[in-house]
Amino acid sequence: MNVRDHTKEFNVPTNTRKHHDIFPQNIFCVIAGSTGSGKTNLLVHLLKKEKLLNYNHIYVYSATLHQPAYAHLREYYGTLEKQIQQELNQSIQIAHFFEADNQIQNPSELDTNKNHVMIFDDVMMEHQDIIKQYFCQGRHNNVNVFYLCQSLHTIAKHCIRDNANVFILFRQDDKTLKYFHETHISGDMDFSEFKQFCDGAWKKKHGCVVINIWD
């Protein structure tokens, strides 16, 4: 049966520009690693690297906004916002920073004509339901999510782990790595091969493994 492609006729939000080809159109990323592993430094790199991520606004929810990485981002975006204001003669806010216990904005409230990056770093457990909504419904609102955690076991399987399409793993213990292999990798390689691959990456300082689970 020949099926006509009607998707171009659908009234859906559009991304005018895509991310770099290494990422899917909408990113739902879990970054897992212990304290000091390099999670936040990697996040800063992703946000600042030219032509890597396409976004109009970022929202950061973190219990550790006092750490140097977020202080640096505040200064970086503050300078950028001032430059844009001078050039375009209009006020603009790109970056929004919130303590982890603040009420998280509902994804349905975001402007679907803009690209958004949501960052959840060490957020309170009572906010997990709204974060699940971002992983389940975010693509309809041009949302990209980066969820930073110390352990994959602390992440709700339903919605978050099941809908994540990118995993960035810093060093994990064998139990956690085996669990991740069983749920995401076992169809592509056996555990010993996967562990060898990860160990090779983790030998480097702040080394990590990036796993894209998307077509």
PLM region spans:
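Electropositive nucleic-acid engagement tracts
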Residues: 80-81
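An amphipathic, basic-hydrophobic helix/alpha-beta surface used to engage anionic
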Residues: 58
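Conserved AAA+ ATPase small/helical "lid" subdomain
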Residues: 188-215
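Short secondary-structure boundary/capping segments
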Residues: 20-21, 109, 200
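Pre-Walker A adenine-sensing motif
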Residues: 5-23, 44
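Conserved P-loop NTPase motor cores
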Residues: 27-53, 63-68, 74, 85, ...
